[in-house]
From Swiss-Prot:
Regions that span the bilayer: 16-36
Topology Virion surface: residue spans: 1-15
Organism classification: Viruses, Riboviria, Orthornavirae, Pisuviricota, Pisoniviricetes
Family recorded in the similarity comment: Belongs to the alphacoronaviruses E protein family.
Protein name: Envelope small membrane protein
Organism whose genome encodes this protein: Human coronavirus 229E (HCoV-229E)
Location(s) in or outside the cell: Host Golgi apparatus membrane
Membrane topology: Single-pass type III membrane protein
Intravirion side: 37-77
GO terms of biological process kind: disruption of cellular anatomical structure in another organism; viral budding from Golgi membrane
Name of the gene encoding the protein in the UniProt record: E
Keywords, comma-separated and alphabetical: Apoptosis, Host Golgi apparatus, Host membrane, Membrane, Transmembrane, Transmembrane helix
Top-level taxon of the source organism: Viruses
CC terms in the record's Gene Ontology section: host cell Golgi membrane; membrane
Quaternary assembly: Homopentamer. Interacts with membrane protein M in the budding compartment of the host cell, which is located between endoplasmic reticulum and the Golgi complex. Interacts with Nucleoprotein.
Amino acid sequence: MFLKLVDDHALVVNVLLWCVVLIVILLVCITIIKLIKLCFTCHMFCNRTVYGPIKNVYHIYQSYMHIDPFPKRVIDF
Protein backbone atom coordinates (compact mmCIF):
# COMPACT_ATOMS: atom_id res chain seq x y z
CA MET A 1 0.00 0.00 0.00
CA PHE A 2 2.98 2.24 -0.41
CA LEU A 3 2.25 5.27 -2.69
CA LYS A 4 -1.40 4.32 -3.06
CA LEU A 5 -3.80 7.13 -2.19
CA VAL A 6 -7.06 5.56 -3.34
CA ASP A 7 -7.84 1.87 -3.85
CA ASP A 8 -9.25 2.15 -7.38
CA HIS A 9 -7.82 -1.15 -8.69
CA ALA A 10 -5.71 0.70 -11.32
CA LEU A 11 -8.71 2.38 -12.93
CA VAL A 12 -6.95 5.73 -13.25
CA VAL A 13 -3.88 4.17 -14.86
CA ASN A 14 -6.10 2.16 -17.21
CA VAL A 15 -8.04 5.26 -18.25
CA LEU A 16 -4.82 7.22 -18.81
CA LEU A 17 -3.34 4.43 -20.92
CA TRP A 18 -6.50 4.18 -23.01
CA CYS A 19 -6.45 7.96 -23.52
CA VAL A 20 -2.84 7.73 -24.72
CA VAL A 21 -3.76 4.89 -27.10
CA LEU A 22 -6.72 6.84 -28.48
CA ILE A 23 -4.62 9.96 -28.95
CA VAL A 24 -1.96 7.97 -30.83
CA ILE A 25 -4.62 6.37 -33.06
CA LEU A 26 -6.14 9.79 -33.72
CA LEU A 27 -2.74 11.24 -34.65
CA VAL A 28 -2.05 8.34 -37.02
CA CYS A 29 -5.45 8.83 -38.69
CA ILE A 30 -4.88 12.57 -39.07
CA THR A 31 -1.42 11.90 -40.54
CA ILE A 32 -2.83 9.43 -43.08
CA ILE A 33 -5.57 11.88 -44.10
CA LYS A 34 -3.01 14.68 -44.52
CA LEU A 35 -0.80 12.36 -46.60
CA ILE A 36 -3.72 11.50 -48.90
CA LYS A 37 -4.54 15.20 -49.31
CA LEU A 38 -0.88 15.88 -50.13
CA CYS A 39 -0.94 13.15 -52.79
CA PHE A 40 -4.04 14.69 -54.41
CA THR A 41 -2.47 18.16 -54.31
CA CYS A 42 0.76 16.90 -55.92
CA HIS A 43 -1.23 15.08 -58.59
CA MET A 44 -3.24 18.20 -59.45
CA PHE A 45 -0.05 20.30 -59.54
CA CYS A 46 1.72 17.81 -61.82
CA ASN A 47 -1.39 17.54 -63.98
CA ARG A 48 -1.29 21.27 -64.69
CA THR A 49 2.46 21.77 -64.92
CA VAL A 50 3.81 18.52 -66.40
CA TYR A 51 1.16 16.26 -67.90
CA GLY A 52 -0.84 19.01 -69.65
CA PRO A 53 2.07 20.58 -71.57
CA ILE A 54 3.45 17.16 -72.51
CA LYS A 55 0.03 16.18 -73.85
CA ASN A 56 -0.14 19.41 -75.88
CA VAL A 57 3.35 18.85 -77.31
CA TYR A 58 2.40 15.28 -78.22
CA HIS A 59 -0.73 16.47 -80.06
CA ILE A 60 1.34 19.04 -81.94
CA TYR A 61 3.81 16.29 -82.87
CA GLN A 62 0.96 14.03 -84.02
CA SER A 63 -0.51 16.73 -86.25
CA TYR A 64 2.96 17.50 -87.66
CA MET A 65 3.72 13.84 -88.44
CA HIS A 66 0.29 13.08 -89.91
CA ILE A 67 0.46 11.77 -93.48
CA ASP A 68 -2.68 12.02 -95.56
CA PRO A 69 -3.68 8.76 -97.26
CA PHE A 70 -3.30 8.40 -101.02
CA PRO A 71 -6.37 9.20 -103.08
CA LYS A 72 -8.10 6.21 -104.68
CA ARG A 73 -7.08 7.32 -108.18
CA VAL A 74 -3.38 7.00 -107.39
CA ILE A 75 -3.76 3.54 -105.85
CA ASP A 76 -5.77 2.15 -108.82
CA PHE A 77 -3.04 2.81 -111.41
